[in-house]
Amino acid sequence: MRRIKPLSEDLIRKIAAGEVVERPANVLKELIENAIDAGSDRIDIFIEKGGKRLIQVVDNGEGIHPDDMLDCVKRYTTSKISSEDDLYSISSYGFRGEALYSISSVSKFSIVSRPEDLSVGKELYIEGGVFRSFTETGAPVGTKVRVKDIFFNTPVRKKFLKSERTEFVHCLKTFINYAVVNTDIHFRLYHNGRELMNLPPSDLKKRITYIYPELSGRLLELDYTDETGRIYGYISTDERFKKEGIVYVNKRPVKNRELRKIIKSLISEKFYVLFIELPPYFVDHNVHPAKIEVKFKNDTAVKNLVREGLKALETPFKKGVTFDYTVSQRKGSYGKEKVFDLLGQVENTFIVVYYDGDIYLIDQHVVHERINYEILMEDLREDGFIKRKILNRNITHSISELEKALIEDKKGTLERSGFSFDIDGYNLVIKEIPVFVSEDQALDIFFRILMDEDAETVDYVIGEIACKLSVKSGDILSDEKAKLILKRWFETDSPNLCPHGRPVYYKVSIDDVKKAIGRG
């Protein structure tokens, strides 16, 4: 029989670190939050190898007093709260007192800091949670934190880190989340010694367009207040700009599935930066150590605030209903003809069919995605590259320094996905595109592949393109269009699931219906 025994301090540290630090982007998040909480107006961030080799954050904030430096890396030590009541009136980003403890437990960690009232600074060095040195050093006012070789002492966790590019994309998203909202701070971001972003203080709209230059002149402002709180921000009017939107609650980037559902239902897939302001007691950030998830005292009131705010936009967004079938038709006949009765369309989402004694509710987007996926897979070359077509006129699109770096990092995947292109200064010049993509769709699909950290294989890319080319929930289908989709669906190799594994249909047995209403 195995006996129960207490864990070692070393193992406790590593387990605790896993709750806060899963990848380099988590480290970056915590360090940026600390720098902002320190009252900085300038923050420089240096990343190497996607954060796997180094993350360094330098700020000009108030610094840490030497007497507090040894305490700042202990668990549950913080200057930001002192009582339970403080949890319900939090104005700072950090408050749990776990971040530096966790980070220093799984890295080679150093912190140099100097308050304004002292002439010299102090440097603390910790390696894998073990104290190494605490020395006096020359330093400017502020704090510099260096995190090297993350997970060097936990090889299993290190093994699960993704590629340098994937980890950097996660770091980049984290950086953007905080750079967008903190417009009074001058941010600079470097990767592998190269400056990618230089964001001087500005207003919110300018900050967004500094980060995403292609949105200049293409942002719609929102500002709405009710008895619950306020929602404000900007929404892209550019249909081609397909990046994940950002939601802030009291200036903290958060994830809330229900809010995102509401937003998507009203503005479709457009990019947005939305801020929700609520009384502090209305929000519980203390749900998870990462503080990304959030709960509300009154979910319904917050949902209504978001819903009514978006409905109040001067230019309401309407879902488009154009969905030309742009890929080549499958070669050969349809095989054995399937006899079915098309009953109609429900909520512009489900095609309803009577077939072989049963009723089928078929998800129109999912079924079309399955058809497109199989047709596109037939257009692969033998070497695994997607076939290309030459454009009559090159597509030229201005790009930022950041996008330029990402394109260079992901050049191989983009080329395998059917794109041939050059970079001319800060212009992307596309010469060839996948055979099944129209010129109007080319830029959208190019940037979807670029910004999706999972888009490494051609199979995955084809799944994403099939999704993009397919009819959407909310599109109105003519009977002819619905019948064409159904005929093509019946001949697919895997009719039950879409490429992402979602079921295509739900079957209702007529016999079960008869039994339920007493006719069985």
Swiss-Prot record:
One of its GO terms (biological process) is mismatch repair. This is DNA mismatch repair protein MutL. GO terms for molecular function: ATP binding; ATP hydrolysis activity; ATP-dependent DNA damage sensor activity; mismatched DNA binding. The keyword Membrane does not apply. PANTHER family: DNA MISMATCH REPAIR PROTEIN MLH, PMS, MUTL (PTHR10073), DNA MISMATCH REPAIR PROTEIN MLH1 (PTHR10073:SF12). GO terms for cellular component: mismatch repair complex. Disulfide bonds: none annotated. Keywords: DNA damage, DNA repair. Pfam families: DNA_mis_repair (PF01119), HATPase_c_3 (PF13589), MutL_C (PF08676). The keyword NAD does not apply. InterPro entries: DNA_mismatch_repair_CS, DNA_mismatch_repair_MutL, DNA_mismatch_S5_2-like, HATPase_C_sf, MutL/Mlh/PMS, MutL/Mlh/Pms-like, MutL_C, MutL_C_dimsub. This protein is involved in the repair of mismatches in DNA. It is required for dam-dependent methyl-directed DNA mismatch repair. May act as a 'molecular matchmaker', a protein that promotes the formation of a stable complex between two or more DNA-binding proteins in an ATP-dependent manner without itself being part of a final effector complex. It comes from the Bacteria. Belongs to the DNA mismatch repair MutL/HexB family. The gene is mutL.
